[in-house]
């Protein structure tokens, strides 16, 4: 019999599947409430870790187009709906599962592709988005800082050359005046000689 609470639960789980870029199905048999709270804190705000009913989750998964979970929905089930960094969340889940053997990672979905437990572990082994962005920023920053150093070195070299050539530049007008006087002196002497004649 379908009740409004079941319809609402299916709608919520379906919505969680659709809004997430990844989801991981776990069995949590034997975990305490305190351990579940610790796991939720480790997963962060971008991941919703929900204890779910298997039959309702199967309906929601089908409505959301997530077929990977159907044969794995057995026993006490919780699903991590990941809306943020899937790598970081998968790492938090796998680290917690290593420390707490009661949490068993069964299967997952990442960007529409089904993952088995080994696939979730492989996802967790990837570098986090923040680390990847930091590496890209470092690669992009390196040529810019190298170019800045080259430009600064050229500027210093030009200043040094400009500083050394400044006295020469000041001497140049004086030399030009002396040369002009030398040219003018014979011309004046020739003019004076023609006037005398």
UniProtKB/Swiss-Prot annotation:
SUPFAM superfamilies from the UniProt entry: Ribosomal protein L10-like
Region (Disordered): 162-197
Superkingdom assignment: Bacteria
Pfam families noted in UniProt: Ribosomal_L10
CDD domains: Ribosomal_L10
Biased composition (Low complexity): 163-197
InterPro entries membership: Ribosomal_uL10 (IPR001790), Ribosomal_uL10-like_sf (IPR043141), Ribosomal_uL10_bac (IPR022973), Ribosomal_uL10_bac_type (IPR047865), Ribosomal_uL10_CS_bac (IPR002363)
Record keywords: Ribonucleoprotein, Ribosomal protein, RNA-binding, rRNA-binding
Cellular component, GO annotation: large ribosomal subunit
Record GO terms (molecular function): large ribosomal subunit rRNA binding; structural constituent of ribosome
Entry's Gene Ontology BP terms: translation
PANTHER family to which the protein is assigned, alphabetical: 39S RIBOSOMAL PROTEIN L10, MITOCHONDRIAL (PTHR11560)
Assembly, per entry: Part of the ribosomal stalk of the 50S ribosomal subunit. The N-terminus interacts with L11 and the large rRNA to form the base of the stalk. The C-terminus forms an elongated spine to which L12 dimers bind in a sequential fashion forming a multimeric L10(L12)X complex.
NCBIfam families (UniProt xref): PRK00099.1-1
Function recorded in the entry: Forms part of the ribosomal stalk, playing a central role in the interaction of the ribosome with GTP-bound translation factors.
Family: Belongs to the universal ribosomal protein uL10 family.
Protein's UniProt name: Large ribosomal subunit protein uL10
Organism, scientific name: Paenarthrobacter aurescens (strain TC1)
Gene label: rplJ
